[in-house]
Amino acid sequence: MKKIISTLLVAGCCLTSLMAQDVVVKGPDEKLQLVVFTSSAEKPSYSITYNGKTMLEKSPLGMNTNIGDFAKGMKLTGHTVTPIDTVYHQDRIKTSQVHYQANELNCHFENPKGQKIDVVFRVSNNDVAFRYALPRQDGKGSVTVTAEETGFRFPQQTTTFLCPQSDAMIGWKRTKPSYEEEYKADAPMSDRSQYGHGYTFP
């Protein structure tokens, strides 16, 4: 009986340790939530929910470059969360003064070769953005991305409001795609662009 209890305690500790590797950051109003999954058994990934509703299912992170693989076997070595609160001005948009608030999560990863990469997320009340930051390594002045591993896995019921990308040099005085095409509201994610060139965000 003691052996069984000891085994359960060890298993519980291991499970807690694995779960503790997942990193959570929320927007300032705590409705928008990002989770970064960093279990060593798989590639790093992330998901997004809003008010408990899934906006983005577990999606892969990472990339391959000419100096190393930053997608598989990545280990989280640390992370920081920094609140962002700033005001900036634009004289050519509808709102000239913008008050921007967000929480920034910086995840520090290391691949099996000890090469480092940061994934920097920003979560505001309505938006999520992220970027990769590669510190200079082995004296390299530039890096070539050879394969993109980043994914965006939307729930099956997701619909779109997108503008199909037009053929080039057609229409009035051959100026397209200078004008927006007709939008289709709540179109299924599986619908292909009518021109075969993908879509443009409005």
What are these regions (language model features)?
Residues M1-D22:
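Bacterial Sec-dependent N-terminal signal peptides
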Residues D22-P202:
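N-terminal accessory beta-strand-rich subdomains and adjacent acidic, glycine-rich linkers
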